[in-house]
Amino acid sequence: MDFLQRDTVTIAKDLLGVRIIYHDELQTFTGYIVETEAYIGTKDRAAHGYNGKRTPKVESLYKQGGTIYAHVMHTHLLINFVTQLEGQPEGVLIRAIEPEEGIELMAINRGKNGFELTNGPGKWTKAFNIPRHLDGSKLNEGRLKIDTKNRKYPKEIEASGRIGIPNKGEWTHKPLRFTVKGNPYISRMKKSDMRQPEYTWRI
């Protein structure tokens, strides 16, 4: 996947349906990305790189596109894929996954099952048993990979405001969150809006 020659919003949309794979010492976990959020760098008041902020904790965000930026928020590990050229702190937060392989162990890792398994940015990383030390490593060069060949394609993509970023002016409501419409593994999904997962993808 091209993380350098396309804008971050385009990448965030294109990641929907991409197969994500993590190999730990015991198990391979896989699933399909169903929810992303784009963060647009120095001008984005909700972004970690807003105004060029650069600390050791966010240093990975300034690396070349295709780098993994892993950070902890409220004890939850969040995984972002860095986009753009080195020095431009833009990226895509992977918010939710439709699980595929390793579901039984995911349920043990999470202490949950069903749609609660992976329907949030800290939930799927716990289900997949992803460690923080992936921060700064390159996607597809270690244990965390994406597969763009054996992927799915959403029937419909919805755009909405990002979650959990109040008081950021216009950036609070900008439609930079992208979801596979109706997929039940999306975070904060109303039951009345849920469809069976197979009906949310193009055949």
From Swiss-Prot:
It comes from Staphylococcus saprophyticus subsp. saprophyticus (strain ATCC 15305 / DSM 20229 / NCIMB 8711 / NCTC 7292 / S-41). It is an enzyme of class 3 (hydrolase). Its EC number is 3.2.2.-. The lineage of its organism: Bacteria, Bacillati, Bacillota, Bacilli, Bacillales. Belongs to the DNA glycosylase MPG family. Keywords: DNA damage, DNA repair, Hydrolase. One of its GO terms (biological process) is base-excision repair. CDD domains: AAG (cd00540). This is Putative 3-methyladenine DNA glycosylase. GO terms for molecular function: alkylbase DNA N-glycosylase activity; DNA binding. NCBIfam families: 3mg (TIGR00567). SUPFAM superfamilies: FMT C-terminal domain-like (SSF50486). HAMAP family: 3MGH (MF_00527).
